[in-house]
């Protein structure tokens, strides 16, 4: 009995530590973000809620590969789905989540990307993020404020940025070898 109580106590303590670590990481990320901590929290909640609702549709989840990125209430959908009906179903689910201000549906109608393609996309995302570190001529620019996602060689850029920052980020992303095109999903600050 004593061992069971100790195990439960240890589990409770460890789960509390995990929450502190995760919460601390979110707080550090929010310190560099132009969004308020509350907005960062809301965006994460929108993503979790949308994924939960999408995962309830087994037909949809087994035949589609959907990635959702939410930034400042703007929901970006990328990935693949087999037909327009599924593309519309995904959009409807996400658009109905409380807090979504705008939906950008970039799902492509085709077979799911291969593991090789997904690996190339992840590599491109990393290369673009690393390339943004070279921006040092724009005052107070912080590359962590730019969300970079890639699907089938197309790079999607999100964030609250100035127009100068956006132009420079897009220019750098376009120069990364392997990038097919760049899509701006930015919101602008003055």
Model regions: which residues?
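N-terminal targeting leaders
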Residues: 2, 8, 18-190
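C-terminal motif of bacterial Sec signal peptides marking the signal peptidase cleavage site
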Residues: 13-16
């Amino acid at each position: 009995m004593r061992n069971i109580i100790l195990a439960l106590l240890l589990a409770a303590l460890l789960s509390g530590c995990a929450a502190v670590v995760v919460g601390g990481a979110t707080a550090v990320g929010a310190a560099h973000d132009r969004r308020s901590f509350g907005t960062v929290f809301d965006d994460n909640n929108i993503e979790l809620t949308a994924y939960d609702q999408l995962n309830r549709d087994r037909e949809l989840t087994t035949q589609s590969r959907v990635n959702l990125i939410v930034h400042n209430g703007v929901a970006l959908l990328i990935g693949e789905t087999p037909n327009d009906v599924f593309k519309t179903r995904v959009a409807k689910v996400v658009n109905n989540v409380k807090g979504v201000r705008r939906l950008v549906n970039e799902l492509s109608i085709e077979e799911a990307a291969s593991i090789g393609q997904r690996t190339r996309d992840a590599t491109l995302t990393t290369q673009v993020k690393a390339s943004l570190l070279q921006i040092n001529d724009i005052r107070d620019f912080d590359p962590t404020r730019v969300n970079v996602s890639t699907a089938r060689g197309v790079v999607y850029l999100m964030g609250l940025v100035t127009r100068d920052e956006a132009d420079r980020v897009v220019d750098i992303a376009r120069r990364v070898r392997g990038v097919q095109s760049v899509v701006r999903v930015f919101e602008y600050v003055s």
